[in-house]
Structures are given as C-alpha cells and as structure tokens.
C-alpha cells in the first residue's frame, strides 16, 4: 500500500468517525440538555484559551518531564514539528499555532503535547500550556461565531464563555476545537502535491 493510499484511508476513517459522532449527537437532541455537560481539556495557544473534548485525549505529555525528544522530519508541512517515540509508538506532532496560522513566538519553550486519538490514529498537538479538565454545561456552549477571529470557524465546534466574576462583565471566550475537522484538513493538506 502506498503512503498516499494509506493516508487517504486514514482520512476516510476520520470522516467516518465524524459522521458517526454527528449521528449519535442527533439522537441525543431533545433530551434534557440543561443537565448535561461536556467534559473538555483546556489549553492555551498564543495567549488564547481553547479546549478539546476529553474523550479524544489519549494522554498529555511534557517533553522535559517525560524525557521525550521531538525528531524533525524532512519534506513535511511546516506545522508538523516532527515525531516522538511514545513507548514504541511513533506519533506525529503538529504545532497547532502554525496549523492555525497563529503567532508562533516562544516555540523553543513549549513542552506540552496533547496526544489525541481519533479513528484509531494518534497525533500529538503541541500547545503552550494545559490548564486541566473542565465541565462545560451544554446549554452554555454556543455555536462558533466570529468571537474567535484567529481560527477559522471550520475548526471550531463551539464557544464557551467563562465568567471572570459574578457580574459576567469580563468573560473568557474558550474555543472548542473540532478534532475531526482538524485531522481531516491536515490529512487533505498532506495529500495535496506541493513543495514543503
């Protein structure tokens, strides 16, 4: 099987997983949404807060504490910083700031990698910092609007406004990343013939 055929198959699996999740979500519409919560892992990219659904998270690694080396690869898109060897498994590491065209300062100081799993594929996302797990009430999550201007709405699965105080006058907007959309777009970019 050629590399391009293998990558095409992975893209198909990601799309299939996204369709299955969408179908399952449709079945839950109309249930008591007010009492349901969405468990996410919060993190920072370029001083902005984002989140990923916790069920996609395989693990969170620190390259220094876990003694992980990111090995760079020739001939790959700029956003792929390299690969890591995690207990014998080779995992690609994507710099989300470069992928989303965000400011990429302090790259040498970044040590946090969120390992996500989707459609039997594991990928690492290089992020500035990880804030931990949070529960967002489903009724408080809004569809992606223009509030988050730095990332295309195609890559967002919603926004959550976290109040800084009881008056709700200062709220932090947290963009919820659509993992399937990111991985599908990333795979499609790799399949396009271009000079890296």
Where in the sequence are the language-model features?
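An acidic, low-aromatic, low-complexity terminal/linker signal
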Residues: 1-196
């Amino acid at each position: 099987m050629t590399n391009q055929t293998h990558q095409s198959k992975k893209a198909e699996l990601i799309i299939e997983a996204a369709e299955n999740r969408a179908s399952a979500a449709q079945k839950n519409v109309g249930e008591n949404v007010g009492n349901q919560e969405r468990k996410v892992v919060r993190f920072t990219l370029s001083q902005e807060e984002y989140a990923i659904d916790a069920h996609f998270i395989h693990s969170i690694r620190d390259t220094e504490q876990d003694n992980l080396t990111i090995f760079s690869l020739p001939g790959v898109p700029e956003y792929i910083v390299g690969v890591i060897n995690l207990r014998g498994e080779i995992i690609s590491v994507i710099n989300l700031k470069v992928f989303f065209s965000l400011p990429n300062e302090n790259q040498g100081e970044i040590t946090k990698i969120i390992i996500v799993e989707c459609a039997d594929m594991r990928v690492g996302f290089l992020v500035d910092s990880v804030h931990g797990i949070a529960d967002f009430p489903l009724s408080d999550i809004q569809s992606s609007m223009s509030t988050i201007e730095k990332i295309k709405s195609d890559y967002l699965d919603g926004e959550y406004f976290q109040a800084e105080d009881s008056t709700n006058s200062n709220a932090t907007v947290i963009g919820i990343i659509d993992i399937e959309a990111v991985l599908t777009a990333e795979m499609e970019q790799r399949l396009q013939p271009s000079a890296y």
